[in-house]
Amino acid sequence: MKTTLDYVDAVKIKHDLPSDYALAKLLGVSKQAVSNYRLGKGGFDDLTAVRVAELLDLNPMEVIAVANRERAKSEDARRVWTGLFDRFAANFEGLLGMMGQRPALRAA
């Protein structure tokens, strides 16, 4: 499953951002928030997850599920969000498969 850091790096690369400061400005968060994402000390809130999804042309539910999994306080909650992500990924891949496309949504 992807992580906040995967999305942070993807936005930075896709938008050719020179620094985490530029990334913070684009996301509408503080530089400290980006530092926390990098250090694994915090994840996206739902609004930031939606912004990230829009910047990467992804379905917002994918990024929201990942963010909520990382914020979950219990193993049960993490399983729920992981399951939601997996179901979303499977359904989305199936839909794209019918259209002749195969994205790599699942990540180990």
Question: What function would you assign to each model-found segment?
Answer:
Residues M1-P18, M61-I64, R102-A108:
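A short, Lys/Arg-rich alpha-helix, primarily the initiator
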Residues D6, L23-G28:
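Long, hydrophobic N-terminal alpha-helical segment
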Residues L17-S19, F44-L47:
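Residue-level signal for the short linker/turn that defines the boundary of a DNA-recognition helix
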Residues D20-A24, V52:
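Short alpha-helical "recognition helix" segments of helix-turn-helix
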Residues L27-F44, V66-R69:
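Recognition helix of helix-turn-helix/homeodomain-like DNA-binding domains
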Residues D46-E62:
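DNA major-groove recognition helix of helix-turn-helix/homeodomain DNA-binding modules
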Residues A65-A108:
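Short, charged recognition helix plus adjacent turn
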